[in-house]
């Protein structure tokens, strides 16, 4: 089941708005992220998102050039590390505070535009 990033953001906001849920889910999410291991490869979470959708392609095209360059560099570095069966040293690995959602605003904007376009394409005019 493919979910839109909008629904994921709404679910995250719902969880974070409730203190009890937030106290339960946040530590679990932090443990899951730590065990995922992508930070030890030099990647940020947004680098792992599926690129082969039109919405993601639009979002990636809208990234500023320095963000796009650093994203490509992180992905190439991770590929090289995977080929050599190595991990980055702890001081070069991505820290949790550096793992920001740099791509999410662009994805949300592209999803909103795609939704509006779909609505306009399917509009029915009643006579």
UniProtKB/Swiss-Prot annotation:
SUPFAM superfamilies: 14 kDa protein of cytochrome bc1 complex (Ubiquinol-cytochrome c reductase) (SSF81524). Signal peptide: none annotated. It is found in: Mitochondrion inner membrane. One of its GO terms (molecular function) is ubiquinol-cytochrome-c reductase activity. It holds the Pfam family UCR_14kD. GO terms for biological process: mitochondrial electron transport, ubiquinol to cytochrome c; mitochondrial respiratory chain complex III assembly; regulation of filamentous growth. InterPro entries: QCR7, QCR7_sf. Keywords: Electron transport, Membrane, Mitochondrion, Mitochondrion inner membrane, Respiratory chain, Transport. GO terms for cellular component: matrix side of mitochondrial inner membrane; plasma membrane; respiratory chain complex III. It is a peripheral membrane protein. Induction: Expression is repressed by HAP43. Disruption phenotype: Reduces recruitment of inflammatory cells and attenuates the virulence of C.albicans infection in vivo. Leads to mitochondrial dysfunction and shows defects in biofilm formation or the maintenance of filamentous growth. Leads to decreased vegetative growth on several carbon sources including maltose, citrate and acetate. Belongs to the UQCRB/QCR7 family. Component of the ubiquinol-cytochrome c oxidoreductase, a multisubunit transmembrane complex that is part of the mitochondrial electron transport chain which drives oxidative phosphorylation. Plays an important role in the uptake of multiple carbon sources such acetate, lactate, amino acids or GlcNAc present in different host niches. Component of the ubiquinol-cytochrome c oxidoreductase (cytochrome b-c1 complex, complex III, CIII), a multisubunit enzyme composed of 10 subunits. The complex is composed of 3 respiratory subunits cytochrome b (COB), cytochrome c1 (CYT1) and Rieske protein (RIP1), 2 core protein subunits COR1 and QCR2, and 5 low-molecular weight protein subunits QCR6, QCR7, QCR8, QCR9 and QCR10. This is Cytochrome b-c1 complex subunit 7, mitochondrial. It comes from Candida albicans (strain SC5314 / ATCC MYA-2876) (Yeast).
């Amino acid at each position: 089941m493919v979910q839109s990033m909008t629904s994921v953001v709404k679910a995250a906001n719902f969880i974070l708005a409730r203190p009890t849920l937030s106290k339960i889910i946040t530590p679990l999410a932090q443990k899951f992220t730590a065990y995922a291991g992508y930070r030890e490869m030099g990647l940020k979470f947004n680098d792992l998102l599926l690129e082969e959708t039109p919405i993601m392609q639009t979002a990636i095209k809208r990234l500023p050039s320095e963000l796009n360059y650093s994203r490509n560099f992180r992905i190439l570095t991770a590929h090289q590390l995977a080929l050599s069966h190595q991990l980055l040293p702890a001081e070069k690995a991505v820290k949790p505070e550096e793992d920001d959602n740099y791509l999410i605003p662009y994805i949300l904007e592209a999803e909103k535009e795609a939704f509006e376009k779909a609505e306009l394409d399917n509009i029915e005019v009643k006579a």
